[in-house]
Amino acid sequence: MEIATLDEIVKQSLDFFAGSRPPSLDVSGFSYPFVIGSGNASHTGRIIFSGRAAIIGDESNFKALAEAYKEAIAQKLIRDTVVISASGEKDSVWEIEFAKSLGLKTTLLTCKPESSAAKISDTVYSYKSIAEPYTYNTSTYLGMILSASHENPADIKKFIETVSLPPNFGSYEAYAFVLPDTFQSIAPMVEIKRDELFGPHVMIRANSQGISRHAKFVHPWEHELVISVGNENPYFGHTDHRWFIPLPANAGFGLVECLTYYICGQIQRAKPQYFKEHITGFCTDYGPKAYGKPEKFEVIVPANG
């Protein structure tokens, strides 16, 4: 089975959205909502609602958050729950049901308008996506981010194609991203890609510039490449193993996500193909079993639209 690398999927996603723009999402109509998602869906919610008052949560803490804010719910200070789920299945179904049991209006952002969660949500924003390997979720969440940021996908692709890898890029054992504070929410998305693509085999870490000052670079190492995005880096990592990537003045979350994912895809190309070796076993065996489901996951998630 042909499994595309992450950098390929990034470029394919940008080409797709250049020709099929996602729906425009105006978050100003939500007043202090719960924004719930799993993994990178939660981080996508944080990005979409950046600069606005919102309560960001996930499947692990949604009920605890609802309990903590029960007085605000009772007083109608909180009226909405936004659930973000590419599949519209798994945890998103009970999250919608739970929000409705609290008397909250529910809005679902999904790539599957016929999904179980979509059938019960009050409002559904449906996003198109390309076919891509399970867990990548690049076009899925990128479409949602672009719908709020209104960045130009063609301009993003043009920028990342100007990025030249430093010599011996693939020989490093570890990679560290230092991101502008504005784009802090991208950092955990990068680390989720590390888990999915490499597991314990390759070290990739990502932090904002501010968080990087908190003892993240106590150990300079010639086998770690420190990748500074948007800001020069005079302090962190071995002095001979730093890579600075300037950003265009109008850079948004979509560009920074695509850039970091693109670089992760280049690392994927340079290393043994851990993901390709293991993803089929995960999707057909212990992955769905962990959810108590007999159905297998699709190794290649089909396109929507």
Set out the residue ranges of the language-model regions.
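Cofactor-/ligand-binding subdomain signature composed of acidic, glycine-rich
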Residues: 1-21, 136-137, 279
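A short, well-structured juxtamembrane/interface segment
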Residues: 14-29, 157-171
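Anionic-ligand anchoring segments at beta-strand to alpha-helix junctions in alpha/beta enzyme folds, i.e.
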Residues: 23-78, 169-214
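Glycine-rich phosphate-binding loops that contact phosphosugars or nucleotide phosphates
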Residues: 29-160, 230-246
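Short amphipathic alpha-helical segments and helix-helix/interface helices
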Residues: 93-97, 166, 191
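Internal, active-site/partner-interface "lid" segment
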Residues: 146-172, 276-298
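Internal helical hairpin/lid segments
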Residues: 186-267
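Charge-biased C-terminal accessory regions appended to nucleic-acid-, cytoskeletal NTPase
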Residues: 252-305
